[in-house]
Amino acid sequence: MGNCCGSKPLTASDIVSDQKQETILGKPLEDIKKHYSFGDELGKGNFGTTYLCKENSTGKSYACKSIPKRTLSSEEEKEAVKTEIQIMDHVSGQPNIVQIKGSYEDNNSIHIVMELCGGGELFDKIDALVKSHSYYSEKDAAGIFRSIVNAVKICHSLDVVHRDLKPENFLFSSKDENAMLKAIDFGCSVYIKEGKTFERVVGSKYYIAPEVLEGSYGKEIDIWSAGVILYILLSGVPPFQTGIESIIVSTLCIVDAEIKECRLDFESQPWPLISFKAKHLIGKMLTKKPKERISAADVLEHPWMKSEAPDKPIDNVVLSRMKQFRAMNKLKKLALKVIAEGLSEEEIKGLKTMFENMDMDKSGSITYEELKMGLNRHGSKLSETEVKQLMEAADVDGNGTIDYIEFISATMHRHRLERDEHLYKAFQYFDKDGSGHITKEEVEIAMKEHGMGDEANAKDLISEFDKNNDGKIDYEEFCTMMRNGILQPQGKLVGIHI
């Protein structure tokens, strides 16, 4: 608007920046702020930040994912961003998939403008369902899951494999009761090629298919990940609980016997009360052999999905577990960091030296590039994606670097959690007033200090681990959470060892 008449002449620097500078997206550089005004930060990852933005010409709100170009240090990373945008364009316009508005590149960043999905995550919706009609049923779960599988079906029909399906990558379009659930993140997605399999380890812990760990896979991995989501929707916990303790800065080569053998627990609560047809569908989706796995189209035709899911309430323990599963990562990461701060030089042995060797510029923190080079020196053959996942796992405060304490907390041996003196020090950190109990306010303060949570998370954590219902967590309850929580490691590691 108003750019055709009366605009000021181009300067020499404009001409250089717009015409001569090599671009990543292959189109002229453009100032996105000519078209959009930026507002609050909506979310942040290690390699990009999503902002609320408003289109100047219409006043309509969108989400904008901005990726600093300095984080795209390799051709592989640049191609990945281009592929993400191409795939979003390719699948845009379909139900249950976020709509892309446009992409821009300036001197500093690449910007992806997309539909704003302001209705919250899956678990938020389930909370709302419980509050609106006092219970959550298999029928509710089937309605939610239908949208997830439909997104997978669309991707596969358009020759796209998502590769990173998880609850966090789905958002509701609005707060309306009938809002549509949409897949929002295609950063790991690739095109399917006839007869070609993929080798690179991608995806997120809990949702990764066994063939990904074995190094040869196809689109069937999306069915596995969706099956894990359904298991969580019906029980509140994932079927294969490989947590943050299994991903340390020494390796990302996880070999988890439980995943590879596909052992499913249908005996513990609430499974005896869940319908046979629901368990039958999960079994079809979490079949070890990819070629025997049910397709997305057939999932949608399964009897449980076609209005046969019971409408009776699921045990309240399921909702309780979901809240725990969502909030536990943050508190346990923070507690591990507190324990790491209290370890002696003797206890951490060679970890300090390893950190110093990786911290090439002696800044006191390890950048992505330093982590990548350090792992290479130790003989690691990790891909760019795998190094990124390590970075995300170890970077507790989400500032894009790993400081010394974060490094120690990610690499220290987990038997430290068995020692009472370490657990007590961590407990004392949260117990600010020395009362012998941790309150919601104390959890909230600790998590806010590290930029790791909000009041809702703190309240959920207190309620889930407060076994005697006094509104506080005592020391015994804290130890139980740390030692026996859902993030207890169950796999083993191969690769580099410290």
UniProtKB/Swiss-Prot annotation:
Chain ranges of the Protein kinase domain: 36-305
Lipidation (N-myristoyl glycine): 2
InterPro entries to which the protein is assigned, alphabetical: CDPK_Ser/Thr_kinases, EF-hand-dom_pair, EF_Hand_1_Ca_BS, EF_hand_dom, Kinase-like_dom_sf, Prot_kinase_dom, Protein_kinase_ATP_BS, Ser/Thr_kinase_AS
Root EC class: transferase
Pfam families named in the record: EF-hand_7, Pkinase
SMART domains: EFh, S_TKc
Keywords for this protein: ATP-binding, Calcium, Kinase, Lipoprotein, Membrane, Metal-binding, Myristate, Nucleotide-binding, Phosphoprotein, Repeat, Serine/threonine-protein kinase, Transferase
Example of a GO MF term: ATP binding
Keyword Membrane: yes
Reactions catalysed according to its record: L-seryl-[protein] + ATP = O-phospho-L-seryl-[protein] + ADP + H(+); L-threonyl-[protein] + ATP = O-phospho-L-threonyl-[protein] + ADP + H(+)
Membrane topology: Lipid-anchor
Gene Ontology, cellular component aspect: membrane
Activity regulation text: Activated by calcium. Autophosphorylation may play an important role in the regulation of the kinase activity.
Residues that, per the record, bind Ca(2+) 1: 359, 361, 363, 365, 370
UniProt remark on domains: There are 3 contiguous domains conserved in the CDPK subfamily: a kinase domain, an autoinhibitory (junction) domain and a calmodulin-like domain. The autoinhibitory domain (309-339) inactivates kinase activity under calcium-free conditions.
Annotated family: Belongs to the protein kinase superfamily. Ser/Thr protein kinase family. CDPK subfamily.
Function: May play a role in signal transduction pathways that involve calcium as a second messenger.
Protein's name according to its UniProt entry: Calcium-dependent protein kinase 22
Gene behind this protein: CPK22
